[in-house]
């Protein structure tokens, strides 16, 4: 029977049949717990690892005693505003002991600022919120695997993998010889390694590992006789080319495997080794050959010939028996040797581990033991923030240790202090690098609260020490049985990362070793009752148990209602009697992740569509007016609460005041607390973060209540979209390919309107020619352009701006050229005012507009931290209200996505019998083949819920069924089939068939048409091919590719094609002439030779092929260089020049730049290049500086004509003359830059000169 449940301030009718036994854990505890562990234990552990540091003589000793974290300099909000890192100073107490004099110096040393985690599990690095994603890696330990040889024989392999250190790999061959590879070198017989470890004779080896034909065959291959020989043999492999000596070899082996600094298994590696190699796991199912006796007390544990079950195996193991001969079911006899269970604190391997691994391999040949599945979650562990940070910190400390040792030997022993020894740079750099550029440190996805939450719960197999996309095969990516309750089988990205990035399941948690655990209810085997005792199991432990599903019916006393219970055991689904069941699931949603658990009727959707649904919910933009779904799953409240976007009451109390910007609560202990609300700030993704109070003055609040909604929340529940009236029908072909038809009402009433905030910044820097200045006094700009700027030259808040408008006025000093006599006179008369400055103002980018909502100014005078060379920084925030429009992408929660094709006036939309027009029309063809029937269930239940005026919850795998929905429809007096007659809005006639209609939750996704639409007339061109760049970011053109050319060829549209491939693309001269012809209203001239064709010729010539281009009559066509063509076109266009510098004249069109107004190098009035007499000019340093300046700033060089302002008075010079004979290549560079500079100048105007 459906029951009413409270979800925050709202009640929902829940169709759940299963009672919640366990409350869901905090959804971001994974991040917080890991970081807390790092601060508590992780840091301490590392300082202990490197302490004490001794110099090479052993006289000076440096010890790290303890550490403390200070208070952060700025609050979280201030850090975001000032673009600094939220961090606290780390101080370490260090003791320096001089053993000769016995002198002890203690000092507190500052070890850099350490980034702190915010309460929501993020870090603020340089003002941006970032998340450290947890990594799934292969756990350290030993892994056994098998392969079938082409001859049909089974070969076994064993690999011992440490967390850091040398790998040890064992393998067998066709002749049953066991080999070992030490640290990826050439293989040796495994007995050589055993000898080197101190088992000198053959007999000792056989006694240690157990006698078998495999070991005897390996001994036959082994040429060594003694421990020394074996050591030398290994040394030859590891250090080829060095003279071998037994002592050196022993030392090498010692450091390679038994030195804690060089070899580290971690606790988890030791735990896994002990677990895999222990007797109790290996002897179950065999029988004893001799009597088994307790090694210490002499007590008989088992007689000969007794079958060993689980209990007896544990008893033998706990007694400390390390080796046992057992009989297999097929009669074979095997000696099983364990590793002697070294203490969990031993982080290196021990001799007995290697013996036990070789013994395990021998047992595998006989059929005892099991090979490992590398993709099983028992063999993969999670490295969370704390551990990732610890590994990075360790690298920094190791580098620091090296520096300290060097300084100890160099500095004077008597006056030395700890502070002088320690160089914190490597540590600070390692931490900075980790947070700034590690693959696992991600810019937080803040599109909506769900995106934030999912980002923090993500598990990635990529990253340092993990897999790479290219190498990862299908097996790693597949859903595995051990994922049940640990990783979501649904939520993973589509594309190259599929299966490599997953999401933590709802109830999962991570244990001390980094393995994912999931909770189960224990079943009492005696009474057969399902208890409320909760046990967390790792994937390994789960494999031993038979587990019933959460929806298995129970009697009121907690026993199973059916005599056969459907259960899981490893990868099988079994029907077993209740007495055999060990555990039961706690909840049906423990299988899936948060995002997937938010999809109602998930059980009715095809998995691949559910995957799209859970991924697309994370892309929903927060809307202006939020609305929780009529049909939810009951997870909405919890996910909004844990995401941290809402304001939560910290204690019980009464609301004194609630305004738009703050809520004031008086607690019961009479304390008054002010909660500041976030107002219209920009998220990482440019969406709008805004909080609004949902309590009123006088309301009573309890601890943990939501008192203010954040973005995409409604009354404390997650609200990513809106409930709209949907019909599944065709509409004049506008549904083609999943397109969506919407009612104009949705635009008019701002149903799907969202606010987007863009940030633009402008820096005033120091340049070589003087400081840049932020000012209202901008050259060559009319007063109408400056109308919205204040006296400083910064736009006023509230101004409406369009593309190209000035946001911040800024001028940059121009390079001074040699002045002519006239200019000197003017300068003398008018003073400095005529000094040249360039307009480098910050303007609104192409295609953007909006209203200025905030301006922030940072200057050095105010003590703001600015990057070097920056004197002032201005940030302008621009907001846009984006109504829903054609081309926007929308989706439901079931993977049903589409693009809006048409917006229909309200009066033309189909309407219901009561006159209500439909809001959205979806294509009915999107349902059958996609198999996401959940949307149909949702639309029926939504209609009933809306009519009855209630909200309902249908939890995943435990929600409403067809019968429930039918009952709800009848209760609401709606047709039980959920269909109704619709009338055509244009004719008023009813449609032929009834149509499925109802309320459905629709999302507006982040792929907005305003961000994607783009157009260009002229713009930047590529340097080599001279073709327009591509893409919106580069302000590029539309690519006309090979296949498009075929299309025009097929039509025979020769002229269109010719002009697309020449004057509209890379015929440089043709472009200029065509532009001029259009401006003058003349006929467009014949196209010339495209630049890319010249590039092709040049490439062929570079292969030493003499390529000529001939015309129809066989005459050679001369292909001019780009620069010569430019000179020619300037002459053709009659551009007047003055001493190599262009005369100021208005450009024909503001945007197209100065394509026709090229800087002319020559003009008819001047001698041609050949006639210029050669002058050898020795360059003085100042001149060289100017050449360098011209090279650094190509645009400026181009603007002043070729000479770059270097020529004397009116004398134009040849480039080559500027350099001595040895400098031809430099001269070429200037030429190259000259060509480029002119192009840049055309394309960008002066804007891009920085």
Swiss-Prot record:
A GO term for molecular function: ribonucleoside binding
Catalytically driven reaction(s): RNA(n) + a ribonucleoside 5'-triphosphate = RNA(n+1) + diphosphate
CDD domains to which the protein is assigned, alphabetical: RNA_pol_B_RPB2
Cross-referenced Pfam families: RNA_pol_Rpb2_1 (PF04563), RNA_pol_Rpb2_2 (PF04561), RNA_pol_Rpb2_3 (PF04565), RNA_pol_Rpb2_45 (PF10385), RNA_pol_Rpb2_6 (PF00562), RNA_pol_Rpb2_7 (PF04560)
Signal peptide: none
Keywords: DNA-directed RNA polymerase, Nucleotidyltransferase, Transcription, Transferase
Function (record text): DNA-dependent RNA polymerase catalyzes the transcription of DNA into RNA using the four ribonucleoside triphosphates as substrates.
Protein's recorded name: DNA-directed RNA polymerase subunit beta
Organism: Symbiobacterium thermophilum (strain DSM 24528 / JCM 14929 / IAM 14863 / T)
Upper taxonomic lineage: Bacteria, Bacillati, Bacillota, Clostridia, Eubacteriales
Gene that produces this protein: rpoB
């Amino acid at each position: 029977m459906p029951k009413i449940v409270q979800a925050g301030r709202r009640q929902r009718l829940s169709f759940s049949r299963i009672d919640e036994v366990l409350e869901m854990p905090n959804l971001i505890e994974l991040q917080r717990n890991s970081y807390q562990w790092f601060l508590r234990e992780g840091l301490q552990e590392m300082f202990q690892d490197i302490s004490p540091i001794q110099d090479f003589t052993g006289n000076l000793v440096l010890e790290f005693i303890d550490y403390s974290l200070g208070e952060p300099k700025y609050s979280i909000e201030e850090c975001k505003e000032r673009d600094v890192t939220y961090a606290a100073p780390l101080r370490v107490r260090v003791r320096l002991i001089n053993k000769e004099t016995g002198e002890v110096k203690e000092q507190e040393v500052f070890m850099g600022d350490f980034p702190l985690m915010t309460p929501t599990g993020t870090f603020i690095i340089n003002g941006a919120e970032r998340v450290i994603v947890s990594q799934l890696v292969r756990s350290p330990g030993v892994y056994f695997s098998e392969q079938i040889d082409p001859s049909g024989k089974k070969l076994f392999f064993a690999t011992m993998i440490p967390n850091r250190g040398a790998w040890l790999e064992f393998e067998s061959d066709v002749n049953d010889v066991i080999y070992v590879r030490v640290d990826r070198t050439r293989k040796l017989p495994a007995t050589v390694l055993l000898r080197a470890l101190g088992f000198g004779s053959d007999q000792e080896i056989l006694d240690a590992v157990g006698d078998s034909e495999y070991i005897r065959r390996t001994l036959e291959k082994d040429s060594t006789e003694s421990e020394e020989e074996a050591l030398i043999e290994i040394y030859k492999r590891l250090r080829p080319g060095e003279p071998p000596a037994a002592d050196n070899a022993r030392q090498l082996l010692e450091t390679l495997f038994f030195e804690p600094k060089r070899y580290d298994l971690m606790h988890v590696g030791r735990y896994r080794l002990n677990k895999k190699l222990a007797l109790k796991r290996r002897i179950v199912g065999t029988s004893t050959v001799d009597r088994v006796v307790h090694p210490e007390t002499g007590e008989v544990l088992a007689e000969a010939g007794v079958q060993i079950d689980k209990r007896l195996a544990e008893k033998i193991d706990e007694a400390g028996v390390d080796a046992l001969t057992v009989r297999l079911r097929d009669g074979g006899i095997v000696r099983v040797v364990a590793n002697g269970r070294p203490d969990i604190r031993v982080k290196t391997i021990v001799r007995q581990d290697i013996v036990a691994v070789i013994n395990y391999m021998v047992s595998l040949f006989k059929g005892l033991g099991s090979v490992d599945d590398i993709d099983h979650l028992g063999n993969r562990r999670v490295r969370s923030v704390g551990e990732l940070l610890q590994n990075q910190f360790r690298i920094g400390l190791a580098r620091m240790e090296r520096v300290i040792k060097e300084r100890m030997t160099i500095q004077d022993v008597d006056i030395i202090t700890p502070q002088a020894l320690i160089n914190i740079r490597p540590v600070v750099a390692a931490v900075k690098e980790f947070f700034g550029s590690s693959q696992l440190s991600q810019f937080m996805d803040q599109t909506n609260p769900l995106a934030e939450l999912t980002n923090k719960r993500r598990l990635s197999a990529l990253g340092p020490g993990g897999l790479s996309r290219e190498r990862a095969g299908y097996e790693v990516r597949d859903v595995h049985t051990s994922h049940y309750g640990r990783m979501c089988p649904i939520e993973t990205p589509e594309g190259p990362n599929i299966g490599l990035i997953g999401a933590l399941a709802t109830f999962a948690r991570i244990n001390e070793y980094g393995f994912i655990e999931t909770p189960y209810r224990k079943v009492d085997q005696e009474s057969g009752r399902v208890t409320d005792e909760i046990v967390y199991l790792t994937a390994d432990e789960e494999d031993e148990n038979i587990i019933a599903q959460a929806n298995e019916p129970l009697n009121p006393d907690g026993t199973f209602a059916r005599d056969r219970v459907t259960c899981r055991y490893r990868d099988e689904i079994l029907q077993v009697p209740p007495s055999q069941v060990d555990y039961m699931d706690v909840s049906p949603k423990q299988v899936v992740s948060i995002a997937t658990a938010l999809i109602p009727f998930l059980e009715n959707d095809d998995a691949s569509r559910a995957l799209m649904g859970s991924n697309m919910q994370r892309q929903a933009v927060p809307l202006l007016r939020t609305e929780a779904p009529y049909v939810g799953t009951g997870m909405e409240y919890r996910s909004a609460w844990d995401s941290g976007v809402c304001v939560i009451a910290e204690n019980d109390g009464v609301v004194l005041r609630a305004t738009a910007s703050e809520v004031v609560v008086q607690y019961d202990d009479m304390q008054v607390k002010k909660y500041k609300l976030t107002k219209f700030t920009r998220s990482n993704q440019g969406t709008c973060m805004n909080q609004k109070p949902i309590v009123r003055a006088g309301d009573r609040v309890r601890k943990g209540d939501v008192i203010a909604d954040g973005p995409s929340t409604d009354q404390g529940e997650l609200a990513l979209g809106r409930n709209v009236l949907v019909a599944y029908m065709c509409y004049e072909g506008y549904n083609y390919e999943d397109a969506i038809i919407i009612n104009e009402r949705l635009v008019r009433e701002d149903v799907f309107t969202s606010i987007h905030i863009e940030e633009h910044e402008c820096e005033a820097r120091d340049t070589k020619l003087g400081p840049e200045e932020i000012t209202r006094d901008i050259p060559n700009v009319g007063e109408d352009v400056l109308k919205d700027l204040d006296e400083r030259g910064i736009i006023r808040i509230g101004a409406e701006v369009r593309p190209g408008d000035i946001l911040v006025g800024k001028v940059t000093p121009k390079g001074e050229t040699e002045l002519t006599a006239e200019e000197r006179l003017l300068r003398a008369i008018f003073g400095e005012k005529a000094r040249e400055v360039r307009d480098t103002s910050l303007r609104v980018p192409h295609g953007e507009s909006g209203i200025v909502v905030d301006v922030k100014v940072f200057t050095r005078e105010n003590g703001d931290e600015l990057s070097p060379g920056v004197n002032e920084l201005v940030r302008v925030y621009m907001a846009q209200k984006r109504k829903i429009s054609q081309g926007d992408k929308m989706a439901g929660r079931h993977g049903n996505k589409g693009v809006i094709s048409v917006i229909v006036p309200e009066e033309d939309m189909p309407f219901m019998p009561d006159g209500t027009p439909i809001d959205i029309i979806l294509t009915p063809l999107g349902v059958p083949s996609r198999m996401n029937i959940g949307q149909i269930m949702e639309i029926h239940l939504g209609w009933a819920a809306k009519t009855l005026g209630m909200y309902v919850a249908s939890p995943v795998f435990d929600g409403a069924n067809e019968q429930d929905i039918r009952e709800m429809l009848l209760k609401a007096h709606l047709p039980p089939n959920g269909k109704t007659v619709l009338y055509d809005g244009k004719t008023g006639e009813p449609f032929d068939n009834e149509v499925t209609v109802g309320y459905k939750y629709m999302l507006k996704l982040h792929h907005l048409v305003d961000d994607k639409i783009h157009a260009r007339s002229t713009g930047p061109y590529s340097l080599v091919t001279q073709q327009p760049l591509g893409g919106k970011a580069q302000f590029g053109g539309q690519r006309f590719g090979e296949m498009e050319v075929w299309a025009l060829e097929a039509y025979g549209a020769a002229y269109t094609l010719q002009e697309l491939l020449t004057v509209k693309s890379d015929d440089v001269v043709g472009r200029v002439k065509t532009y001029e012809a259009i401006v003058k209203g003349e006929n467009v001239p014949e196209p010339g030779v495209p630049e890319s064709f010249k590039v092709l010729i040049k490439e062929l010539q570079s292969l030493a092929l003499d390529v000529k281009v001939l015309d129809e009559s066989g005459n050679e066509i001369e292909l001019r260089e780009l620069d010569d063509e430019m000179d020619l076109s300037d002459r053709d266009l009659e551009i007047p020049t003055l001493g190599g510098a262009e005369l100021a004249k208005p450009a024909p069109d503001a945007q197209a730049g100065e394509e026709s107004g090229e800087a002319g190098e020559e003009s008819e009035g001047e001698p041609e290049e050949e006639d210029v007499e050669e002058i050898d000019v020795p360059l003085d340093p100042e001149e060289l500086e100017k050449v360098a300046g011209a090279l650094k700033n190509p645009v400026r060089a181009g603007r002043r004509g070729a000479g770059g302002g270097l020529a004397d008075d009116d004398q134009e010079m040849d480039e080559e003359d500027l350099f001595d004979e040895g400098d031809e290549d430099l001269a070429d560079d200037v030429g190259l830059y000259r060509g480029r500079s002119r192009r840049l100048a055309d394309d960008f105007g002066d804007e891009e000169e920085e």
